[in-house]
Amino acid sequence: MSAHTLDAYRRDLTALSAWASEQATDLVSLHPEQLRAFIAAEHRRRLSPKSLQRRLSACRSFYRWLLKHGRIDASPAATIRAPKAPRKLPQVLDVDEASRLVEVPTDVPLGLRDRALLELFYSSGLRLSELCALRWRDLDLAEGLVTVLGKGQKQRSVPVGSHARAALAAWRQERPADSDAPVFPGRNGPITPRAVQLRLNQLAQRQGLFKRVHPHLLRHSFASHVLESSGDLRGVQELLGHADIATTQIYTHLDFQHLAKVYDAAHPRAKRKR
């Protein structure tokens, strides 16, 4: 457990101890109803669902420890649930914005590298860590495939679009390298995630995208645009390398948002009065 988590848990248990004292009891003597009342009181204090979940997690860990050491007979936290945190929808670029971003000029220093990096990022929906770790041996430009090692050491192959293939070929011609070399080299080995983030911010402003653009935005945009065009949730899950399809389902909400906008703009009974 990290030092940051330990500090957070210490604050959570201190808050619970203070509340228990106000109720003329102590941590060891708390009943489930009292612990539930504590969580409700914290909710009324407008603690976020995420903070409440962490607070309850600290309580569960503490009472598991007491149970293990014979200080209590049962955990009062065992059956208590905190309010679920609302899941934020990921931000995405629309198709025009994504195209504008990746079509950076190639006749400037590092232009071919930047074009290849952005085209591949958007074309294949890679994670930032996967993109940075790429070696030329991982790319098959003739077949249009890139093979990456994702989370949980799971390997997957993802298609590479024609624009990305052309950009990568131009970049390799500009800077020849053997098959074991990084596709996007940095100062000492592969380019770092931080370097990609900084470069992306620079390029976004240069391309006229005056919004917060971060590396994962291209992966979100890839997923949203492929799902919008295909409607194949399972296919998008495999392309992204998600172990659980529930993780991919967040993009169906984005697709619904798009459909809702189309409906509002096109349906004769949905148009707003001016």
Predicted features along the sequence, with ranges:
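Conserved catalytic core of the tyrosine transesterase superfamily
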Residues: M1-R274
